[in-house]
């Protein structure tokens, strides 16, 4: 991409607070972008060939939305965790295997998409983020839902297409979780805690494509109670 075209994008972003440069074959963050660290509210560099998120990202103090989908990123810098106003973070289609310890500092974060990465565990940092609403961790390599999950504040959790064979009963204690997607995992029916159906807030449980027939779900204790929640939710949005 030519310098003049990049300059034009940066000039526009200076006025709008939005920098969008997708599918341009970029291999690194545009260095001139740091001139706008006090301006930008949105950055979208999706569908490029970026491998490294530079530490300068931590200087974008007003940033609310960051999209780096479909790049070649394998790790996130600690400095990213300084983005106190960040509400939306899209990182699907990268090579990320873990999150920085300081990820817990992203206290404004509401939406996180890490679909199609290399996570093997459910990141514990997510259980400390009080404003998190939607989490997409589908298409990773996660094998279990741990006991600590009860700290998760999300309303929707997508774990489709992982390798999950174990679920902690504590998933039932997530205070706001209404939508749980577990399609195409490695679950036996016996590994599904009945309390997910009877004692949780969950009104949509998607478990198609596991190691049991979906109609067997009806045999679980608490299924009728779950169906009441499911039907009530459907009526609300009808």
Curated annotation (Swiss-Prot):
InterPro entries on file: Leu-rich_rpt, Leu-rich_rpt_typical-subtyp, LRR_dom_sf, LRR_domain-containing
The keyword Acyltransferase appears for this protein: no
Record-level GO cellular component terms: cytoplasm
PANTHER family: LEUCINE-RICH REPEAT-CONTAINING PROTEIN 57, PTHR48051
Name of the protein described by the UniProt record: Leucine-rich repeat-containing protein 57
Keyword set, alphabetical order: Leucine-rich repeat, Repeat
SUPFAM superfamilies: L domain-like
Residue windows of the LRR repeats: 39-60, 62-84, 85-106, 108-129, 131-152, 153-175, 176-196, 201-221
Species of origin: Xenopus laevis (African clawed frog)
């Amino acid at each position: 991409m030519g310098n003049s075209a990049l300059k034009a994008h940066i000039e526009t972003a200076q006025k709008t607070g939005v920098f969008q440069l997708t599918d341009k074959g970029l291999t690194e963050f545009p260095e001139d972008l740091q001139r706008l660290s006090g301006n930008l509210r949105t950055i979208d560099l999706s569908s490029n060939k970026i491998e490294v998120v530079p530490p300068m990202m931590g200087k974008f103090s007003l940033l609310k939305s960051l999209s780096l989908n479909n790049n070649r990123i394998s790790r996130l810098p600690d400095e990213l965790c300084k983005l106190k106003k960040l509400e939306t973070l899209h990182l699907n289609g990268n090579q990320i295997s873990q999150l920085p310890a300081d990820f817990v500092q992203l206290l404004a974060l509401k939406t996180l998409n890490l679909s199609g990465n290399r996570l093997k565990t459910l990141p514990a940092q997510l259980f400390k983020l009080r404003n998190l609403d939607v989490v997409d961790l589908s298409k990773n390599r996660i094998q279990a839902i741990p006991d600590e999950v009860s700290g998760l504040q999300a309303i929707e959790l997508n774990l489709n297409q992982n390798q999950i064979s174990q679920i902690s009963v504590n998933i039932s204690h997530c205070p706001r979780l209404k939508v749980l997607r577990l399609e195409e995992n490695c679950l036996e029916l016996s590994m599904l805690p009945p309390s997910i159906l009877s004692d949780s807030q969950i009104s949509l449980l998607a478990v198609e494509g596991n190691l049991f027939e979906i109609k067997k779900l009806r045999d679980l204790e608490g299924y009728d109670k779950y169906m009441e929640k499911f039907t009530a939710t459907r009526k609300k949005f009808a």
